Amino acid sequence: MLELAYLQTLPQQRALLKADYADFIVKEDLGYAMTGEGEFVALYVRKTDANTLFVGEQLAKFVGLSPRNMGYAGLKDRKAVTEQWFCLQMPGKAMPDFSRFNMAGVEILQVTRHSRKIRTGSLNGNHFEILLRNAVETDELKVRLENIKNFGFPNYFTEQRFGKDGHNLTQAMRWANGEIKVKDRKKRSFYLSAARSEVFNLVVSERIRQGLANQVLAHDILQLAGTHSWFTADGKEDLALLQTRLENHDLQLTAPLIGETQQLACELENKLVERHQSLISLMKRERMKPARRPLLMQARDFHWEFVENGLKLKFYLPAGSYATALVRELVNIDENE
């Protein structure tokens, strides 16, 4: 992440992230309520230092199911305290006694029924509560906080997307260059996601470097705020009007998530993407579905408080955006190993 541009400038302070699991709290927002009836048993679970997939597998095992009959909306940080829903497909079966389920770091907060499987990606977003230890109240940091509240932060994919020490991206590059073959479906998915995230990040970073993170250009692809609807600034609408709508947060600039048939935007974007032909060829060859992603992101309900041992943050992000991308604009991160 160090080579990527900052929307503001390089932060002056260092702070410790995840010194304790409770310093990083995530609460899932599915955007819908459980129905209270149906063939799926739904469990709302609090996890501390626990892997999402492993917890789900253990819940399935506890009731005698295959992991295929278990569902969840998204993977959560392991080094954190996280709350999320799991579901188990159990048509016609009595509700199990989960009071006998015993797993270190796992607490079942609620058990109910639901009519549909909770599928990966079926969530609105996440609520975050983060403590940045050793952060000190200064004018510089207060300005950064206000800027994030008012203007947002680069919507980068962060280290989690690329694997430990960037392993997934390294393997994607080797695959793209013909150095390895990848047959395992799970690895293919991880490597392709890392490749696409890298190209997105580099496009966003270069646009920031050129001072164009908040500037509508001809042929930009814009997203209506709060939706997944896009349109192209192709001259039918006045660029000045689109710029006003962007500044009023009615629109968002987007950058590409490269796929098989990609609609690229402005001339700048085309030039940037051309630099990464090997990765792009790989993604097209593997027939990835193209998409767009907001270039900048604004946290909802963004609040902060300086406390004795650091800076407390509370905010909400839509699914797919990373809290560590926001934190990166505030402080240089020292992560507790």
Curated annotation (Swiss-Prot):
The keyword Isomerase applies. One of its GO terms (molecular function) is RNA binding. Its EC number is 5.4.99.27. Keywords: Isomerase, tRNA processing. It catalyses: uridine(13) in tRNA = pseudouridine(13) in tRNA. GO terms for cellular component: cytosol. Transmembrane segments: none annotated. The active site is at D77 (nucleophile). Residues 152-308 form the TRUD domain. CDD domains: PseudoU_synth_EcTruD. It holds the Pfam family TruD. One of its GO terms (biological process) is tRNA pseudouridine synthesis. Belongs to the pseudouridine synthase TruD family. Responsible for synthesis of pseudouridine from uracil-13 in transfer RNAs. This is tRNA pseudouridine synthase D. The lineage of its organism: Bacteria, Pseudomonadati, Pseudomonadota, Gammaproteobacteria, Pasteurellales.
